[in-house]
Amino acid sequence: MSPKARPLPQLWSAHDPVLAYGSLGRGVPRIVHVHGLGARWQIFKPVMAGLQEHTQLAPDLRGHGLSGRAAGDYSVEAMAGDLIDLLEAHCPEPVVLSGHSLGGWVAMAAASRRPELIDGLVVIDSPLHSRRPDPSITRSYLADAPLALRAVSRSPEQLDPAVLEAYHDGEFAAPCPAEDLLVRFDGPVALLQADEARGGLMSAEDVQRARQAHPRLHHVAFDGVGHAVQVEDSTGLIEQLRGFLEILDEGRCSHAVGTVPAREPEAVGSRVQDAGSGAAASGAARDEDRIEQP
């Protein structure tokens, strides 16, 4: 594959609601990335480019980006249903699901319902301690993390206001605790934990409870990296995802633990703009928003 290969925007118009997604490569998908609250699939563009030896997909969750709006249903279960539909339609073989924050919950819910579709599960700094998201935690994170602010939708049309209403009303509540979701998936799981001192949302208690619930858990802590791991340290995330794929290929994953040492923040100015969640302030579509019908 060309070193300059880039993910391409696609639109699955036959689905209800319509699902926008990015794709890279033309083979059988190996990895599917799921973004968090307020973001779009483009947040994973640097990661997808760094793993371009693998065919990858990354959907916009319902109500986000260019995916369709859903009247009154922005629950984790509904989003997981969309993800399952995408896997069934576009992934003929089991994939690795990589979900960040809210996307981690969506990925866990999908894996618990249809484990046969999923080869491995990567949960990136999702707060696992509560089924019901705490808006105060997210407000604090957004206030303290400038990089995160640049990763959420900038234009109103890119995020259905009802998504935030559902979040604050508790409609994002997961169907059961995280450890119960993990118990239903017997494949390998990786927890990638950001630094709590830098705004990371996955706690040490989250990790401990998950380790007790799942016998094949791989845990890595990112020292000095905040919640938006894929933005603040895309290189480190690429390395960890590639390593997890190697673990899967070698058939070994049993309570492995590691730490990604703190490194200088990446020069993300132009990268974040490219990977960001919203369209330009004028509302005009950028090149990345030009849709190709599959």
Name these PLM-found stretches.
Residues 105-112, 119-148:
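Flexible "cap/lid" loop of the alpha/beta hydrolase fold
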Residues 22-66:
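Conserved HGGG/HGGXW glycine-rich cap/lid loop of the alpha/beta-hydrolase fold
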Residues 151-187, 193-198:
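Hydrophobic, aromatic-rich cap/lid helix
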Residues 1-31, 52-55, 92-93, 119, ...:
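Alpha/beta-hydrolase fold catalytic core
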Residues 78-95:
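Conserved acidic catalytic loop of the alpha/beta-hydrolase fold
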